[in-house]
């Protein structure tokens, strides 16, 4: 049974669908997930702890036996899972979404300057993530696999620390985009492109939070 003293990130690791519940009340399970459920709820002030625990325990009870939980994968298999479930889809979405973000800024930016800032923030986020994922695939993940196989990797702790630092910076950019878009709520006058961009940026945020959680709280723990 999930209780108020359980750590937010650990609950999501054990029951991945709990991420949806934490997200719905604005609780960070990603870079800020190393706090108790009680502490996270108190920080939000408007979250009823008992109701939150009830919802989380409902998820625990309906957890499907036999469904894939990445925490049970070994390091090399988990890395393959991360690459196929997150790295490849993110690269594809960046390629497809960027023209719409650019169009939104160009067409509506003159009258809504925050859309220009949104594009600039998105570009920083996109370029940082692309560079980060490529470095993981080419340099960092092979080191983690070598470590799992018993080889000596002298800088393994530095590798992990640097990746976590990158994730924190990524989280800050996501927060900024959410603030610029009023949590991705388009104004009444928003056109179809505007609504499309907000919808897909919100989905991108969800995917990135899941991605970072899996690396910070599952993958890195297996090699630290």
From Swiss-Prot:
Annotated TM spans: none
GO biological process, alphabetically ordered: protein repair; response to nitrosative stress; response to oxidative stress
This protein's GO CC annotations: cytoplasm
Coiled-coil region(s): none
Protein induction: In stationary-phase. Induced by hydrogen peroxide.
GO molecular function: iron ion binding
Phenotypic consequence of gene deletion: Mutant shows increased sensitivity to oxidative stress.
Record keywords: Cytoplasm, Iron, Metal-binding, Stress response
Localization annotation: Cytoplasm
Pfam families named among the record's database cross-references: Hemerythrin, ScdA_N
InterPro entries: Hemerythrin-like (IPR012312), RIC_family (IPR019903), ScdA (IPR023551), ScdA-like_N_sf (IPR038062)
Oligomer status and interactors: Homodimer.
Similarity annotation: Belongs to the RIC family. ScdA subfamily.
Known function: Di-iron-containing protein involved in the repair of iron-sulfur clusters damaged by oxidative and nitrosative stress conditions.
Protein name: Iron-sulfur cluster repair protein ScdA
Source species taxonomy: Bacteria, Bacillati, Bacillota, Bacilli, Bacillales
Gene: scdA
